[in-house]
């Protein structure tokens, strides 16, 4: 567990109305998504999602007016430190801007979660660089989960050497704050499958949740989505349904992931899934390219595809308020 105090793409393919592997057509996918920028404010209450597009200074989540005792945290994702390519020639610069944006929110987050692909090539130097950069975040705690780019060639050992203190197994863990139970999962170690949890981790989740009352709000972090967003590209977790079954009894469950480099929301009963954008480079919309490769957009539009996420919760309210903001 990392918790330290240092403080546009080609035309859609012509099967847009055919169901995909997970039962959603590509047109249905688009209805769930907020592609390439635009701050999307989402309120999760009673298993329903209400959303609208908002500017960075939208009044629904004013930074300085949090209710007393509220939990406020930030999700950042997919910084890909070490990436070199035309999709973003300065990922260090854009990640630095994201850190400055977090520090300029007008409040001190209770914690910051980086939901994976901290690095691009899993080198010791890249892990050290991103760790040093995140010490500049004005927060008491920073948590992480690994992405597949953090697990290249060594099943995540170098990642765990830098960010794995206090974790269990291959890097999973849980914690509680402000009446919310958080679970951080690792689903990036089987690169031939991409999204995979494994029996040991699923058993951990079973034991971890067993003693919790069903009215406990639960937030689950992972890198790859825990729902079948687009299995053809590895945007799914093959054994996630076993964890989802354990979460069904809770009245409010929110799953936050990275990996897909774009905003996406899906609700299934009491569980809402939110995919985050990136601080590095955009990926194509599902079905609009042969593969999920970095997309080159005009330089002036790049920041519209990058961003951060803030989440607010007040104890006693069965809701989370989620706001996605493009880089300023």
Label each PLM-derived region with a short phrase.
Residues 59, 65, 123-217, 239-254, ...:
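Extended active-site neighborhood of metal-dependent phosphoesterases/phosphodiesterases
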Residues 76-77, 112-116, 143-148, 221-222, ...:
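Active-site neighborhood of phospho(di)ester-bond hydrolases with catalytic His/Asp-centered motifs
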Residues 83-85, 118-119, 188-197, 227-232:
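Surface-exposed cleft-lining segments at the edges of enzyme active sites
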Residues 1-28:
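N-terminal secretory signal peptides
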Residues 213-229:
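Short acidic, glycine-rich surface-loop motifs adjacent to enzyme active sites
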Residues 187, 221-226, 258-260, 325:
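Short, well-ordered beta-to-alpha junction loops that form the rim of enzyme active sites
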Residues 24-50:
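N-terminal export leaders
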Residues 17-18, 48, 52-128, 207:
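N-terminal active-site segment of His-dependent metallophosphoesterases
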């Amino acid at each position: 567990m990392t918790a330290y105090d240092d403080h546009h793409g080609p035309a859609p393919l012509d099967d847009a109305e055919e169901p995909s592997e997970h039962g959603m057509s590509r047109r249905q996918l688009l209805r769930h998504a907020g592609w390439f920028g635009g701050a999307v404010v989402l309120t999760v209450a009673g298993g329903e999602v209400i959303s609208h597009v908002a500017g960075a200074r939208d009044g629904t989540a004013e930074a300085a007016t949090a209710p007393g005792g509220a939990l406020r945290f930030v999700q950042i994702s997919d910084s890909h430190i070490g990436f070199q390519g035309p999709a973003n020639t300065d990922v260090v610069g854009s990640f630095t801007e994201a850190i400055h944006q977090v520090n300029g929110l007008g409040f001190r987050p209770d914690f910051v979660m980086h939901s994976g692909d901290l690095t691009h090539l899993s080198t010791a130097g890249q892990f050290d660089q991103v760790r040093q950069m995140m010490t500049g975040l004005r927060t008491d705690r920073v948590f992480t989960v690994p992405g597949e780019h953090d697990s290249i060639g060594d099943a995540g050992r170098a990642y765990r050497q830098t960010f794995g203190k206090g974790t269990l197994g291959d890097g999973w863990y849980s914690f509680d704050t402000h009446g919310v139970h958080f679970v951080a999962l690792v689903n990036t170690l089987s690169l031939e499958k991409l999204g995979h949890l494994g029996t040991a981790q699923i058993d951990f989740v079973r034991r971890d949740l067993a003693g919790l009352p069903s009215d406990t709000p639960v937030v689950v972090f992972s890198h790859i989505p825990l729902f079948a967003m687009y299995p053809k590209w590895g945007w799914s977790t093959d054994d996630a349904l076993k964890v989802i079954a354990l979460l069904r009894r809770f009245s409010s469950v929110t799953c936050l992931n990275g990996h897909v480099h774009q905003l996406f929301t899906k609700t299934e009963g009491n569980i809402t899934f939110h995919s985050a954008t990136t601080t590095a480079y955009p990926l194509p919309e599902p079905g609009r390219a042969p593969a999920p490769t970095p997309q080159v957009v005009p330089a002036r539009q790049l920041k519209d595809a990058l961003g951060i996420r803030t989440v607010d919760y007040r104890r006693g309210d069965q809701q989370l308020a989620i706001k996605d903001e493009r880089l300023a």
